[in-house]
Amino acid sequence: MSDGLDNEEKPPAPPLRMNSNNRDSSALNHSSKPLPMAPEEKNKKARLRSIFPGGGDKTNKKKEKERPEISLPSDFEHTIHVGFDAVTGEFTPDLYGSQMCPGKLPEGIPEQWARLLQTSNITKLEQKKNPQAVLDVLKFYDSKETVNNQKYMSFTSGDKSAHGYIAAHPSSTKTASEPPLAPPVSEEEDEEEEEEEDENEPPPVIAPRPEHTKSIYTRSVVESIASPAVPNKEVTPPSAENANSSTLYRNTDRQRKKSKMTDEEILEKLRSIVSVGDPKKKYTRFEKIGQGASGTVYTALDIATGQEVAIKQMNLQQQPKKELIINEILVMRENKNPNIVNYLDSYLVGDELWVVMEYLAGGSLTDVVTETCMDEGQIAAVCRECLQALDFLHSNQVIHRDIKSDNILLGMDGSVKLTDFGFCAQITPEQSKRSTMVGTPYWMAPEVVTRKAYGPKVDIWSLGIMAIEMVEGEPPYLNENPLRALYLIATNGTPELQNPERLSAVFRDFLNRCLEMDVDRRGSAKELLQHPFLKLAKPLSSLTPLIIAAKEAIKNSSR
């Protein structure tokens, strides 16, 4: 009898998703050659000295040092002229474009682009309808400037390592006294370092989602591109002499050289940031929860407060881009908010850097959206918390640039916090728009895909896509070829919902405000916090049953 009463009093279980979705080393025999061999570098210099006699070796060396060094060309680009024949529906050499650049021959579509297009599933009709969008996504995919830097401070489940970097170091008045500046490095040293980096460059790593919902295309990508021609009042390149301006880490050889810091300089900078002392005396009960390319993640307890924290331990000798760690720490340290997974502390322990962050035991929102069904009240609660985080970041001139369910962490109490600042970009009034292709393709805003200058509202578009994730369990176009997905993002406007009639009018209006193609008409974080949809938000504690149900479903599926 009592058992029957207990069963009646238990709330129904949350609804689950049914388908959780080498060079030639042989030496030349010069003696057999009828022609004289090419003079070596030293012989060239000796001959030049005989032609232009100086005082002595020391004088010549001094003069050589005084001569201005002419660097290799940088930031150059190969302009490809491609036209489109509306009759045949084929991409052709653009004769007019070639005439605009004297000396250039018409090239037509490059072979690698043609191969990409053949496997893209973009139909001939779609190519004919919007050839420029096709070219935009082809340029993005064929870029050789893509980099795969670690997001060092990533603390999400499984210690995911994704493709990303801090695009700008903090430059607010709070941090102006300690900008992570990098002194110039000599050309010879830098070339050697660059060769070593190229040889040791790890292969690209796919950013993870839960195994049962993972797509090979769901990864974060970064492409450094030339800024489009825009009025100076809108975009002004940051001045190298202005210590308070944001210096962008553009992915070019010359700028990588300028941003070099020696290991000793990095250690000196880190010593000025980290806390003094032994973290093993402050934290106890270390438990390993993840291992990644950039380090190992543990949970631990703060002895003084009893707070559970996440600690990432990184061997600095194994980090290829150590200066980016400094930038990421500084960005996180200066942007603390209740809706952000906050940086707590850091320590140098031997050759390791230990970074202490808040720990949220509920896991990522991805687990909830792929394993359970959320109602509008729960979705509104998550959107409100994310908008509060974005309003804070945007008001501090920070764009997150990688908003998606993977980067939203949940506490067991239902708290919602934004994490993963490996892509975040700081902007100043002079640098009010950015034009770097960055983020995860399926969550990208159209202005990013089409390589236009953009601002904080790219995060709002991504939030709208994440809201669709919460409804449907995945973002739009996830099962499309990535090239076609980018084409659809660039051309379709607001993505269509599978069953829009199931959503309330106020929710559909919220989605339309987030997913407005016209950036000027798209809502800002501050504006959307006043949207009527958020009044439907349930208490955050309503998320707890979903978190528990998702954990159970994942545990059962792994058996």
UniProtKB/Swiss-Prot annotation:
Domain Protein kinase positions: 283-534
Polar residues biased stretches: 18-32, 239-250
Quaternary structure annotation from Swiss-Prot or TrEMBL: Interacts tightly with GTP-bound but not GDP-bound CDC42/p21 and RAC1. Shows highly specific binding to the SH3 domains of phospholipase C-gamma and of adapter protein NCK. Interacts with the C-terminal of APP. Interacts with ARHGEF6 and ARHGEF7. Interacts with GIT1 and GIT2.
Region of interest: GTPase-binding: 65-123
Residue positions of the active site: 402
List of residues that carry Phosphoserine: 2, 50, 154, 186
Entry's disease: Intellectual developmental disorder, X-linked 30: A disorder characterized by significantly below average general intellectual functioning associated with impairments in adaptive behavior and manifested during the developmental period. Intellectual deficiency is the only primary symptom of non-syndromic X-linked forms, while syndromic intellectual disability presents with associated physical, neurological and/or psychiatric manifestations.
Binding residues for ATP: 289-297, 312
Family named by the database record: Belongs to the protein kinase superfamily. STE Ser/Thr protein kinase family. STE20 subfamily.
PTM info: Autophosphorylated when activated by CDC42/p21.
Protein name per the record: Serine/threonine-protein kinase PAK 3
Record entry for activity regulation: Activated by binding small G proteins. Binding of GTP-bound CDC42 or RAC1 to the autoregulatory region releases monomers from the autoinhibited dimer, enables phosphorylation of Thr-436 and allows the kinase domain to adopt an active structure.
